[in-house]
């Protein structure tokens, strides 16, 4: 059966002479290799291959094979990366001692002639794999057209289809036929066509089979139409690994654009850049793994490889590979620059690669990059040191040699004279190695050819060994709001605050990060955060954003004077303009609505849904709704305290702690550097909180746990369920503990605030405390009241106020205290949402979309060893992993909290608060844990979620630990 007949390129596309020269070289090489494969049984040839160990190129003369005599110039400009060992020799032999017709690996460096300067160069050996997993060592031809290669899985097993330059014959012509064809060409026949062969021809047959030439057919199976316009990058399948072959200027590590476009086809694909041929005494190893980003040469080579969008989609539909379940890294909605734009920005992109020189393993790989198949590369103090890392295939097949340069100098990341220079700036001597390895901009990373698809297990292995990939949202918001009428604007108070933790957020500081929120009834009117505040490692505020971009640029071009204290490590934003005008719906806890929050940039879009927000229409309804909603304040709740003065004008002052910025910086840095980081247990200790106290702020607030001292004194003798349902009342002694920093207040007495007066005579608990109540906090020891000292930069202090007496003649019997506005506080219950995801390399060069971010509120293990996960935002196909072990999800159900919930829940906070403080629309996942996870020797494993092609960290670990 003959291959697909296609029209051969015209003279307008390809110069005839170069086309014939390239075709002649292809067929000569294919014929020679076919002869070698067929005659491996020859003792003479076998001994020759064993003696040379394939360390020298092999020149073929007719039916004989001899080592090539390479000139010194050829040795200095090219190399061979052989793959041949005793193991492969034994694998290539049958049981009777004879050789296979097609061994797994045969790589030969073949001399080719340079058409411009007549110098002799060598092609780098490589292999290609067809759909039947047969290894073929013939090289592709390359022309000056901007086309790329795609295997045709729908044709014959040995047939390939190609979208342009990389064209391979479906069968190998004989040497005599090639000589006949050369004679025809030399005679000057204008009607000479490329000989093709309609019959199937196996390379293992070598010269023994002579198919009849068919001059009327074009011998290349090519189902897609050639198009020159560069639209989207080509996407080679994992079975083909093109070589790194560019003719480069020896005076520079970066090839010029002229050297790429003006080089002949043979030079373009046959010559390599600065590799050395190993000596015979050197122990042969599999080709070493280069940096995950590849070489600058590869970038220059493949930025010309483009195909049209229709052809790309059609080709992808014909490829049946394990990567089909992964989304393609390039979406039609993502704009791509033209070739001229990429050519123009190349010099800047290459300059921005310098920040990777400390650890090339930190360079972001892509969807099918082999970075997932190896352990993280260790840091090296020698710039030109090679990294001993070997790739493995997903399907358990043979290892394909990687022919990319393996040293930092060959990759163009170091200047040639940097061998004797100190590779670390003085300011980074005591810092973690990845401090200078964070990319400044995702769009500055050049595209590379993807090598292999990845599995979830390999992605988990990568993210758990590269903790810098972890990023997080931490959102704090009130549990209810007041309805606005007409033109009235009752803004949400306290406003929604969003913390951006993890340094990967800061790779796109200049990409105009947008944070917005809207209610479910008003989706078309989102409210945006006006400013995003950034903080450095010491918790100091960095502003404005132009300074952020400047410090990011300094990090990528660091020197002795670089100020790393100006580099941000986390950010936060306040959404102060959110108000609600609807009616809400009754969900059993009162009337409520739902919020949606989104975070988007040029490369990301994340969405948080179903954030419940209680609604009250009038303050007079607050007391009536106490028994049927979450209006009341209970023992263990998270609350926010703010001063009521000008609270409805977005100028409220919020109670916080003096070291909150420094504590959040520590958490964000731990997410980057500490692989054992678990936010449920990673809380500041007493030493870190030494000297910290309560403070006020208007651009940041933090939730506080509120505890009854009487309930805490009961200790283990009380029922935790009863304690969590304990409603707080006035005149009770409480303490406040910051949820973020752990700073604790002194014992305080709750006092109801009425008409600027506070009663001093009542001592017994009386009226229950509910949200938006007016309160005063009296120190239990000094009997003074908590207030804001405006003279001391809004610091927290204590005052006695003006005392009122029932008997003016007896000053010891004061009944009331008249307090200033700075001592009047409002309290409201709050809720927090934490979702952590891994910013993987697979998302670096694609538009990363997560329509629903999951977050886990609490978990528990029942008496039947079934694992329960409670939270929101779960997809129907969510997967639960305990490190590398997958748990089977038995059911996904809506959960309605009640008082019968067992007390053995593990909350996302250090204190197990009541269920009523959680969101009302919880989802319950019931999972079955594998038996192996109950063994006493099981290692500490993070509990991960996988949905929307994204890995999420739940914040919990297995085995479960109550805290």
Curated annotation (Swiss-Prot):
It is found in: Nucleus. Keywords: Cell adhesion, DNA-binding, Nucleus, Transcription, Transcription regulation. Residues 143-207, 249-289 have a biased composition (Polar residues). Induction: Expression increases as the cells enter the stationary phase, with a statistically significant peak at the late stationary phase. A similar increase in the mRNA levels is found in the sporulating cells. The keyword DNA-binding applies. GO terms for cellular component: chromatin; nucleus. The keyword DNA-binding applies. It comes from the Eukaryota. Pfam families: BTD, LAG1-DNAbind. Its main location: nucleus. Residues 130-207, 248-289 are annotated as: Disordered. One of its GO terms (biological process) is cell adhesion. InterPro entries: Beta-trefoil_DNA-bd_dom (IPR015350), BTD_sf (IPR036358), CLS_fam (IPR040159), p53-like_TF_DNA-bd_sf (IPR008967), RBP-J/Cbf11/Cbf12_DNA-bd (IPR015351). One of its GO terms (molecular function) is DNA-binding transcription factor activity, RNA polymerase II-specific. Belongs to the Su(H) family. Transcription factor which function may be to trigger the increase of adhesion at stationary phase, possibly by counteracting or replacing cbf11 at the respective promoters. May also play a cbf11-antagonistic role in the regulation of a number of other important processes such as extracellular material production, colony morphogenesis, ploidy maintenance, or meiosis. This is Transcription factor cbf12. It comes from Schizosaccharomyces pombe (strain 972 / ATCC 24843) (Fission yeast).
């Amino acid at each position: 059966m003959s291959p697909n007949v296609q029209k051969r390129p015209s003279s307008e596309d390809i110069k005839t002479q170069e086309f014939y020269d390239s075709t002649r070289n292809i067929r000569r090489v294919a014929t020679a290799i076919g002869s070698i494969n067929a005659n491996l049984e020859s003792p003479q040839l076998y001994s020759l291959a064993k003696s040379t160990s394939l360390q020298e190129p092999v020149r073929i003369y007719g039916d004989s094979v001899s080592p090539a005599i390479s000139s010194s110039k050829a040795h200095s400009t090219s190399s061979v990366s052989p793959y041949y060992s005793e193991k492969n020799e034994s694998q290539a032999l049958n049981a009777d001692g004879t050789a296979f017709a097609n061994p797994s690996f045969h790589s030969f460096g073949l001399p080719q002639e340079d058409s411009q300067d007549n110098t002799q160069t060598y092609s780098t050996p490589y292999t290609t794999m067809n759909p039947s997993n047969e290894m073929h060592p013939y090289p592709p031809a390359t022309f000056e057209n901007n086309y790329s290669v795609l295997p045709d899985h729908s044709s014959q097993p040995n047939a390939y289809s190609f979208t342009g330059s990389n064209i391979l014959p479906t069968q190998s012509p004989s040497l005599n036929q090639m000589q006949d064809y050369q004679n025809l060409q030399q005679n000057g026949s204008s009607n000479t066509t490329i000989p093709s062969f309609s019959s199937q021809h196996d390379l293992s047959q070598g010269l023994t089979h002579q198919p009849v030439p068919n001059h009327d057919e074009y011998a290349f199976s090519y189902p897609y139409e050639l198009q020159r316009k560069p639209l989207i990058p080509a996407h080679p399948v994992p079975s083909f690994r093109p070589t790194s072959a560019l003719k480069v200027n020896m005076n520079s590590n970066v090839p010029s654009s002229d050297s790429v476009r003006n080089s002949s086809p043979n030079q373009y694909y046959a010559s390599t850049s600065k590799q050395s041929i190993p000596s015979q005494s050197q122990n042969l190893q599999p080709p070493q793994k280069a940096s995950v980003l590849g070489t600058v040469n590869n970038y220059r080579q493949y930025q010309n490889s483009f195909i049209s969008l229709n052809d790309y989609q059609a080709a992808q539909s014909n490829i049946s590979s394990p990567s089909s379940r992964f989304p393609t890294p390039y979406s039609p909605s993502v704009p791509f620059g033209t070739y001229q734009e990429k050519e123009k920005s190349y010099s800047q992109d290459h300059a921005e690669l310098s920040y990777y020189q400390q650890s090339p393993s930190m360079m972001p790989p892509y969807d099918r990059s082999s970075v997932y198949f190896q352990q993280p590369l260790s840091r090296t103090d020698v710039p030109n040191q090679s990294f001993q890392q070997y790739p493995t295939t997903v399907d358990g097949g043979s290892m394909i040699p990687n022919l990319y340069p393996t040293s930092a100098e060959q990759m163009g990341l170091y200047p040639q004279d940097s061998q004797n220079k100190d590779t670390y700036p003085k300011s980074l001597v005591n810092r973690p190695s990845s401090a200078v390895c964070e990319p400044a901009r995702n769009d500055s990373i050049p595209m590379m050819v993807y090598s292999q698809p990845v599995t979830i297990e390999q992605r988990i292995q990568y993210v758990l060994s590269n903790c810098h990939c972890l990023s997080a949202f931490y959102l704090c918001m009130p549990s209810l709001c007041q309805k606005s009428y007409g033109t009235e604007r009752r803004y949400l108070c306290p406003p929604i605050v969003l913390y951006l933790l993890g340094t990967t957020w800061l790779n796109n500081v200049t990409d105009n990060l947008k944070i917005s929120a809207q209610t479910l009834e008003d989706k078309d009117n989102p409210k945006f955060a006006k400013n995003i505040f950034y903080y450095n490692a010491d918790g100091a505020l960095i502003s404005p954003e132009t300074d952020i971009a400047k410090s990011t640029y300094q990090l990528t071009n660091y020197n002795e004077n670089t100020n790393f204290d100006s580099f941000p490590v986390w950010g936060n934003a306040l959404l102060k303009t959110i108000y609600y005008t609807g009616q809400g719906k009754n969900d059993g806890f009162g009337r409520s609505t739902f919020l949606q929050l989104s975070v988007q940039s040029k490369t990301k879009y994340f969405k948080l849904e179903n954030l419940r927000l209680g609604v009250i229409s009038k303050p007079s309804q607050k007391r009536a709704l106490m028994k049927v909603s979450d209006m009341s304040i209970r023992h263990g709740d998270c609350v926010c305290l703010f001063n009521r003065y000008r609270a409805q004008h977005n100028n409220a002052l919020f109670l916080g702690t003096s070291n909150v910025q420094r504590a959040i910086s520590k958490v964000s840095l731990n997410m980057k550097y500490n692989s054992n980081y678990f936010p449920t247990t990673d809380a500041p200790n007493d030493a870190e909180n030494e000297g910290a106290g309560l403070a006020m702020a208007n651009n940041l607030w933090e939730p506080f746990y509120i505890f009854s001292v009487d309930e805490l004194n009961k200790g283990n003798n009380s029922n935790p369920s009863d304690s969590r349902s304990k409603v707080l009342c006035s005149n009770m002694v409480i303490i406040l503990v910051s949820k973020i920093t752990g700073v604790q207040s002194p014992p305080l007495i709750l006092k109801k605030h009425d008409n600027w007066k506070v009663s001093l005579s009542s001592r017994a608990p009386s009226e229950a405390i509910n949200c938006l109540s007016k309160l005063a906090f009296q120190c239990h020891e000094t009997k003074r009241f908590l207030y804001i000292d405006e003279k001391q930069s809004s610091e927290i202090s204590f005052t006695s106020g003006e005392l009122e007496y029932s008997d003016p003649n007896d000053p010891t019997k004061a009944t009331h205290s008249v307090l200033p506005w700075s001592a009047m506080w409002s309290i409201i219950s709050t809720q927090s949402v934490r979702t952590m995801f891994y910013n993987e390399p697979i998302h670096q060069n694609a538009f990363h979309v997560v329509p629903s971010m999951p977050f886990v509120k609490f978990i528990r293990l029942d008496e039947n060893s079934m694992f329960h996960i409670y939270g929101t935002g779960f997809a129907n196909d969510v997967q639960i992993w305990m490190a590398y072990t997958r748990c089977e999800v038995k059911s996904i159900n809506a959960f309605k909290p009640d008082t019968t919930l067992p007390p053995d829940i593990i909350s996302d906070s250090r204190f197990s608060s009541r269920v009523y403080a959680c969101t009302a629309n919880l989802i319950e996942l019931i999972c079955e844990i594998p038996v192996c996870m109950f063994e006493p020797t099981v290692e500490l494993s993070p509990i991960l979620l996988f949905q929307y092609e994204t890995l999420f960290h739940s914040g919990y670990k297995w085995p479960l630990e109550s805290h």
